[in-house]
């Protein structure tokens, strides 16, 4: 096996890591849809899905079979190519962000020195899926949802990036592994508490989750940008939303809660437990908060979150300069 050089071995290991992380993230995103329905039932003092399988354990399989056999319909008035490519972008964009998230000290697909910038790039790419879906459907409700999504994403991605800069300044690196290692003695949640708050809010908005689900507000836009989608195309949008939740939860853990670090248990177990906690917080937020008006969402971002992020960044810079003297 002379062809099995160290370079080839490294490539094969990287591909193996990518496949494993892909399968785990997609599986977690799919199971979260069932877990959300059960937890919402618990929070609202009612039964969740409990008919298919033992205590509803096979509900996810039933939903997948139902969605697989639904008619994959494309409207005659739609732009077929863009209409088809939009759910693929929605599914794959935030999934790419897990390539840079270190699950443990040795398990990361791409240990990029510009990892933070890569995440901001794929987060910005996700909005194109919504824009393509809304525009190509040639439906007024879809188009309104796409316009809302573009305005909301542009607004909230401003302080999504600014909220990370305090962490980057403290760690001295854009590399996520270096950021985790810099939290060996103290997690960033303590010195960067306001950065965590604004990043979490922006993360919910980027995922278009309640209460920032303005692009698909059912009561106003009849499900918004994916109103014309059915079958597996709708399934890609549906699972892609939950993959975004997993990705944002993993990044919150990596940036502010020490990543894989923790006592006694293996590192990947700690990462999974922390990420699962924040995935549950997404569900709790949906069960607890009402949906505000669209103008209130935009005003909250520009008038409250952005100034708070800038103040946090200025204070962080002042503390770093003071300690350097």
UniProtKB/Swiss-Prot annotation:
Gene from which this protein is expressed: nuoH
Record's keyword terms, sorted: Cell inner membrane, Cell membrane, Membrane, NAD, Quinone, Translocase, Transmembrane, Transmembrane helix, Ubiquinone
Compartments, record wording: Cell inner membrane
Transmembrane feature ranges: 11-31, 81-101, 114-134, 154-174, 186-206, 237-257, 265-285, 304-324
Subunit field text: NDH-1 is composed of 13 different subunits. Subunits NuoA, H, J, K, L, M, N constitute the membrane sector of the complex.
Any one biological process term the GO annotation gives: aerobic respiration
E.C. number: 7.1.1.-
Protein name: NADH-quinone oxidoreductase subunit H
Alphabetical list of HAMAP family matching this protein: NDH1_NuoH
UniProt keyword Translocase present: yes
Chief localization: membrane
Catalytic activity: a quinone + NADH + 5 H(+)(in) = a quinol + NAD(+) + 4 H(+)(out)
Keyword DNA-binding recorded: no
Topology of the protein relative to the lipid bilayer: Multi-pass membrane protein
InterPro entries, per database record: NADH_UbQ_OxRdtase_su1/FPO, NADH_UbQ_OxRdtase_su1_CS
Gene Ontology CC annotations of this record: plasma membrane
Family the entry assigns: Belongs to the complex I subunit 1 family.
NCBIfam families, sorted: PRK06076.1-1, PRK06076.1-2
Lineage: superkingdom: Bacteria
């Amino acid at each position: 096996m002379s062809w099995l050089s160290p370079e080839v071995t490294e490539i094969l290991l990287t591909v193996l890591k990518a496949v494993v992380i892909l399968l785990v993230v997609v599986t977690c995103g799919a199971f979260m849809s069932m877990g959300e329905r059960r937890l919402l039932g618990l929070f609202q003092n009612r039964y969740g899905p409990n008919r298919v399988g033992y205590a509803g354990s096979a509900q996810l399989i039933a939903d997948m079979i139902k969605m697989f056999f639904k008619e994959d319909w494309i409207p005659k008035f739609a732009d077929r190519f863009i209409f088809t490519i939009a759910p693929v972008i929605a599914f794959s964009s935030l999934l790419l962000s897990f390539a840079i998230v270190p699950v443990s000290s040795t398990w990361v697909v791409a240990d990029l020195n510009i990892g933070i910038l890569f995440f901001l790039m794929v987060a910005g790419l996700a909005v194109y899926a919504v824009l393509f879906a809304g525009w190509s459907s040639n439906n007024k409700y879809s188009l309104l949802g796409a316009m809302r999504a573009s305005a909301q994403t542009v607004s909230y991605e401003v302080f999504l990036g600014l909220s990370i800069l305090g962490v980057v300044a403290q760690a001295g690196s854009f590399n996520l592994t270096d950021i985790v290692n810099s939290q060996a003695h103290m997690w960033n949640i303590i010195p960067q508490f306001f950065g965590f708050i604004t990043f979490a809010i922006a993360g919910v908005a980027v995922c278009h989750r309640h209460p920032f689900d303005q692009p698909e507000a059912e009561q106003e836009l009849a499900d918004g940008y994916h109103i014309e989608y059915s079958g597996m195309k709708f399934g890609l949008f549906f699972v892609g939303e939950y993959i975004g939740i997993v990705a944002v939860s993993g990044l919150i853990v990596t940036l502010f809660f020490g990543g894989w670090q923790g006592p006694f248990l293996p590192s990947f177990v700690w990462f999974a437990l922390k990420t699962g906690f924040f995935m549950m917080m997404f569900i709790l937020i949906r069960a607890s908060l009402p949906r505000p008006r669209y103008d209130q969402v935009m005003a909250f971002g520009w008038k409250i979150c952005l100034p708070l992020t800038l103040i946090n960044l200025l204070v962080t810079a002042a503390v770093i300069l003071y300690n350097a003297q």
